[in-house]
Structure formats: structure tokens, C-alpha cells
């Protein structure tokens, strides 16, 4: 039977942990108390810290025998990230903690499938929680008061968390979707293209559009790695620009990694590779002084990529595409890669585009399964969307 994992550091938060578990039970859930503390627990638990720590590559001693708190927390986080996904009876996870506990518990939560309920009551939840949530669906709930014993506020917060996780865990199972899901990447400057693709595919596909802001690409690839996507139309690969040239919305070095690992049908393009993103104009690094900038809005500044930068981007993407052995089509719109890169537009630069296209074509090892095709179109032309859809249907239904 599926159970709700109630997770905390029983060495420092034992009283709160037991109370949270009792609230889960009162709400109709089956709680399992899991200790991820690094010292002796103050309460009885169902799964001990030693059990969790034992799955660390260095064994339990690597987690529990040291004297440095920071090292122990990092090691327990690594152990919990291995322990939790291996359990087959998890209906949901609710955690509670301060800085150390939040780091440990969310490390495990991030490894769970999207859709499996996850609630983290944390003293850090009202701040920047990006490092803890990343591209997962963890629900962060502020503890309001510190986790230093039960009081009239903490009791209410923990009870709410217990009722939330129990309600989510006990909801009726949804029917399996009949349409295959596909991931698409979009930016404001490629919206006409992606919208047109969705219109053409939505009748027989569940179209999941991701904003190409760094986290968007990672979220899409996480779904691909999780087996939740049937294919990808990666129209907007702009996150690579920010990775290579220090923008604020970067991909990681693992961009395209899920495509290589899964062999999913993949149609890609060069959407918004004409720009690097920064915040307000004064945040643009000094090394880019004198560059062509475009004020997208008061808080976002775009920098046009040069021919040399475009060539580097093309080589980077091309090398990644060479690692993909699944069916792949990469489409090059010769008349512009974004709404700004069009004749008369702020970023229109045929020389930069040519450098990008030539670097891609030179780098990619082409085969029957891995093809690059030039089209005499702008990326936002309706005919380009039609070509992308045709390419996807060709490789998804060979």
C-alpha cells in the first residue's frame, strides 16, 4: 500500500516531525517517519538515518561519522537523493526543516517523478527557492516561525501541510492521456512559429510548451528523461547563447543530453540564437561595452550575437547533436532566427546568421537519421511551422 513519507531531521526537529506525522494520519493518510538527521534522534522513527545513509556510495560512515556539519548535510542529501526514488510505496512526501533539512529533503524530492505530490515546509520558503526546487514541482510552504518547537503558528502550518499532502496523495488516479505528449521550446520572439506548430499538432498531440529561460529547457529535458514525452520540437535553442556567453537565462552543459539519452524523435532549430539575455541595461557586463543592445522591457536587455559568437554557438550545438542517435532533423530558417532578426529589425545581421548556419553544417555529422535542412524562410513564417510539423511527422511515424 502506498504511504506518505514524512521526512525531517529527528535529531533537531523530532517534536515537530512526530506532530506532522500525526496530522497526516488524522487527515486519512498512512505516514512513515523518515529521519535524515546526522546525529542521534530524539524520537522514534520508522526509517532511520542509518538506513538512508547506507545507500551513500561511501556507506553510512561517509554520512554519519564526520564532525563537519556542512559535509554531513551534503552527504545525507546525496544519500536521500538515492534512497527516495528507489522506494516503491511513495504516495507523497512532506518534509519540514530549516536550511540543512531543506537542502537534504529537496535533494530527494527533485529525483521523484513530476506529479507525485511533494510539499516542503521550510524556513527558507519565502526567499529564493530556485536551488531547492529547480525544475521539479515541489510545493514550498513557508514555516513563518522558526522550527524550534511547536507553537500556535507552527501547529497550524504543519497541519495545513499534512492536509495538503494527504489530499493530493489520496486523489483519484487520472486516466492515462490518449494523445502522445511532445515538448516544444518558445521565446517571445519565436511565439508565432511555435503557436502555429501547436495549432497544427494539437488535434493528435498533447503539446507542452516550455519558455526557453534556462529552467524551461531543463524542465523539458527532465520530462524527456522521465519517459513522459514522445518527441521534441526544440525550436528555440537560445539558452545556449546565455550558457556560452554569460547571460542570465542559461542552459546547463547537459542541454540536449536527454535527447541523446532517450533517442526521442527530435526536430530542432536556431530560434533566438541572435541574442544573449541580461537584466536591466546597467547589469550588462563591462566586457560587452559598445555592443548592440535591445531593451526588451525595463528589466530585460538583449545583446545581439556577433558572427564570431554565432560560429561558436553553432559548433557547440553541432557537437551536441552528434551525440544523438535517434531520428533528428535540424531546420535552418535562412531569412532570420527571431522576430528581431528580420529585414529592418533591430538584430538583422545576415553575416552573423551565416556564421551560425555554416558552423552548424560544418560540425554536424550528417546521416540518414541526422539531417540538417536549410529553408528560404524566416522562422516565424507560417511555411516554416509547416515544415517543422512535416519533419516531425516524418520521423515520429516512419
Curated annotation (Swiss-Prot):
Pfam families, A to Z: UPF0261 (PF06792), UPF0261_C (PF23189)
InterPro entries xref list: Tobamovirus_resist_UPF0261, UPF0261, UPF0261_C, UPF0261_N
Membrane-crossing segments per the record: none
Source organism, top-level taxon: Bacteria
Keyword terms, alphabetized: Plasmid
Cystine residue pairs: none
Keyword set includes Iron: no
Keyword rRNA processing annotated: no
Family indicated by similarity: Belongs to the UPF0261 family.
HAMAP family xref list: UPF0261
UniProt protein name: UPF0261 protein RA0729
Organism: Rhizobium meliloti (strain 1021) (Ensifer meliloti)
Amino acid at each position: 500500500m502506498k504511504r506518505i513519507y514524512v521526512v525531517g531531521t529527528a535529531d533537531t526537529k523530532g517534536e515537530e516531525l512526530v506532530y506532522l506525522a500525526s496530522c497526516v494520519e488524522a487527515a486519512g493518510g498512512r505516514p512513515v517517519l523518515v529521519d535524515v538527521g546526522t546525529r542521534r534522534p530524539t524520537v522514534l522513527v520508522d526509517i532511520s538515518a542509518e538506513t538512508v545513509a547506507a545507500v551513500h556510495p561511501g556507506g553510512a560512515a561517509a554520512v554519519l561519522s564526520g564532525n563537519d556539519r556542512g559535509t554531513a548535510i551534503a552527504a545525507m542529501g546525496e544519500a536521500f537523493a538515492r534512497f527516495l526514488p528507489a522506494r516503491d510505496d511513495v504516495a507523497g512526501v512532506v518534509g519540514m526543516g530549516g536550511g540543512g533539512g531543506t537542502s537534504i529533503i529537496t535533494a530527494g524530492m527533485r529525483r521523484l517523478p513530476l506529479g507525485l505530490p511533494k510539499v516542503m515546509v521550510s524556513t527558507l520558503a519565502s526567499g529564493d527557492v530556485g536551488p531547492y526546487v529547480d525544475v521539479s514541482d515541489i510545493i514550498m510552504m513557508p514555516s513563518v516561525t522558526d522550527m524550534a518547537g511547536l507553537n500556535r503558528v507552527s501547529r497550524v502550518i504543519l497541519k495545513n501541510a499534512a492536509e495538503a499532502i494527504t489530499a493530493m496523495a489520496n486523489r483519484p488516479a487520472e486516466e492515462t492521456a490518449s494523445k502522445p505528449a511532445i515538448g516544444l521550446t518558445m521565446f517571445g520572439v519565436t511565439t508565432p512559429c511555435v503557436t502555429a506548430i501547436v495549432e497544427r499538432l494539437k488535434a493528435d498531440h498533447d503539446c507542452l510548451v516550455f519558455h526557453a529561460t534556462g529552467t524551461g529547457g531543463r524542465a523539458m529535458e527532465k520530462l524527456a528523461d522521465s519517459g513522459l514525452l514522445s518527441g521534441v520540437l526544440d525550436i528555440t535553442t537560445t539558452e545556449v547563447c546565455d550558457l556560452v556567453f554569460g547571460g542570465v537565462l542559461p542552459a546547463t552543459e547537459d542541454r540536449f543530453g536527454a535527447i541523446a539519452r532517450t533517442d526521442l524523435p527530435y526536430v530542432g532549430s536556431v530560434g533566438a540564437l541572435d541574442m544573449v539575455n541580461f537584466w536591466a541595461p546597467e547589469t550588462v557586463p563591462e566586457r560587452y561595452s559598445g555592443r548592440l543592445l535591445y531593451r526588451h522591457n525595463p528589466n530585460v536587455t538583449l545583446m545581439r550575437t556577433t558572427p564570431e559568437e554565432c560560429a561558436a554557438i553553432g559548433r557547440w550545438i553541432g557537437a551536441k547533436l552528434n551525440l544523438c542517435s535517434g531520428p533528428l532533423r535540424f531546420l535552418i530558417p535562412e531569412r532570420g532566427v527571431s522576430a528581431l532578426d528580420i529585414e529592418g529589425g533591430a538584430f538583422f545581421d545576415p553575416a552573423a546568421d551565416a556564421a551560425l548556419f555554416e558552423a552548424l553544417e560544418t560540425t554536424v555529422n550528417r546521416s540518414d537519421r541526422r539531417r540538417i535542412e536549410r529553408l528560404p524562410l524566416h522562422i516565424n513564417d507560417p511555411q516554416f511551422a509547416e515544415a517543422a510539423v512535416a519533419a516531425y511527422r516524418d520521423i515520429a511515424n516512419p
